[in-house]
Amino acid sequence: MNNSINHKFHHISRAEYQELLAVSRGDAVADYIIDNVSILDLINGGEISGPIVIKGRYIAGVGAEYADAPALQRIDARGATAVPGFIDAHLHIESSMMTPVTFETATLPRGLTTVICDPHEIVNVMGEAGFAWFARCAEQARQNQYLQVSSCVPALEGCDVNGASFTLEQMLAWRDHPQVTGLAEMMDYPGVISGQNALLDKLDAFRHLTLDGHCPGLGGKELNAYITAGIENCHESYQLEEGRRKLQLGMSLMIREGSAARNLNALAPLINEFNSPQCMLCTDDRNPWEIAHEGHIDALIRRLIEQHNVPLHVAYRVASWSTARHFGLNHLDLLAPGKQADIVLLSDARKVTVQQVLVKGEPIDAQTLQAEESARLAQSAPPYGNTIARQPVSASDFALQFTPGKRYRVIDVIHNELITHSHSSVYSENGFDRDDVCFIAVLERYGQRLAPACGLLGGFGLNEGALAATVSHDSHNIVVIGRSAEEMALAVYQVIQDGGGLCVVRNGQVQSHLPLPIAGLMSTDTAQSLAEQIDALKAAARECGPLPDEPFIQMAFLSLPVIPALKLTSQGLFDGEKFVFTTLEVTE
């Protein structure tokens, strides 16, 4: 659907049009007029003089000709620069560990007026009930929360145990929902390339909407074939030439800067005046601590401007206009007549200092959002209930037998990247030939009573203790890493007792833990409380060694088989390049 309007998302009644036209002509009173404001021109560069005239949800007019127009209320912007509301092109709200309601409270005052969300984390745990809850939240949100229908539940068939399926029939039931913009990331790219009919059926069913991609490092004929199938974008690019080639072949590029996957520095040099309509910004996975201390899409814009010298109008273009056009949300692309009045007023456009936010023509008050959060969450009817069908384990469950002189595969972590390397290490009577090797295990949590799948992990920086979590993409089984089997067992016990969550164990004791009662993924605490708890968890984790910046988010991707190179699922070690299971011992 790239760059074509979809009228499904821009419904305005004839009566609304008549009222809007009357205000545009100067024959009727506006609801709001924003005075003393300049509008950043995302098309030509430079600025447009205000004011901005608003009627209902929409902009009725822009420019000096409305200086004396009547309004019920006038907003003095005090010389601010106005830009369209920011849009996150791809994210999983669950990865913030906030509910959609809390996420809105945390991000809307920062100018994030629209999100394109794939709720496949909760769908992997709870199936269609999880998607239905996200749809309810989207329907009642002030923020424009659009949904892509999760396409790969589980991420890769036959490679892991997850909590539910999401069939094509169930997917089709949501296709025409007013908040649905398309099909979420098609992660099984080998299946698409090989022409598997079940995957092509999904693509065909959503072809009139937007088809999201997922193809880290893909190139050559395989990339050509993937694009031939109709995939329109990718958020997994992590190399400059990879991103350039995808743009050359007609893909739109989502430049991701999350809490674990940090690709902005690698890809930002690609952005220019010519290709910026095909470039977007996304976070994918960003935790509440970073949102509170650094920001969300606003933080990405700031870095484009300050660190990569991207011109103002181009930086704000890729943060709004490009994404709106890509998803057919043309009513959100500009501050212009007839567009939805999603407006961010900036006291400093270069520093992205947000002064005030309006959504659907109404000013946003952060304190009101916070005061209403609890009631709005209850109104959404969250799917509470314990999703951990797993008994505690003992240290003996993590026992691995090693033979001196033999070589064993090691999952090698790359800090702040989702990809891993597949290396090996030789075992001797004194241990492995590298001192950074620790243990990793994945335990299915959906009642199948499988023994833990165990492996070796290098490069994570864990010198002592253990970390455990039920946030483990995409099936969200229990993942635990540690230096001792006893501490690993204790960490697993704690997250089971919490009904899901995160835990740090050191010196034989639980140092910090965070319960996540909704699907083992999300908390019902406020954003501020969550940020404080995350801070405590990270502080406890740092005592275990020089870990990645976001150890729990990095750990969560160690079991995702659709990202190279070596991962561990509940079924065993998986080669993410050959897409086959492999053995711990290197025999070839």
UniProtKB/Swiss-Prot annotation:
It is an enzyme of class 3 (hydrolase). Keywords: Hydrolase, Manganese. Belongs to the metallo-dependent hydrolases superfamily. Adenine deaminase family. InterPro entries: Adenine_deam (IPR006679), Adenine_deam_C (IPR026912), Amidohydro-rel (IPR006680), Metal-dep_hydrolase_composite (IPR011059), Metal_Hydrolase (IPR032466). The lineage of its organism: Bacteria, Pseudomonadati, Pseudomonadota, Gammaproteobacteria, Enterobacterales. It holds the Pfam family Adenine_deam_C. GO terms for biological process: adenine catabolic process. Its EC number is 3.5.4.2. Its cofactor is Mn(2+). Coiled coil: none annotated. It catalyses: adenine + H2O + H(+) = hypoxanthine + NH4(+). PANTHER family: ADENINE DEAMINASE, N-ACETYLGLUCOSAMINE-6-PHOSPHATE DEACETYLASE. GO terms for molecular function: adenine deaminase activity. It comes from the Bacteria. This is Adenine deaminase. Homodimer.
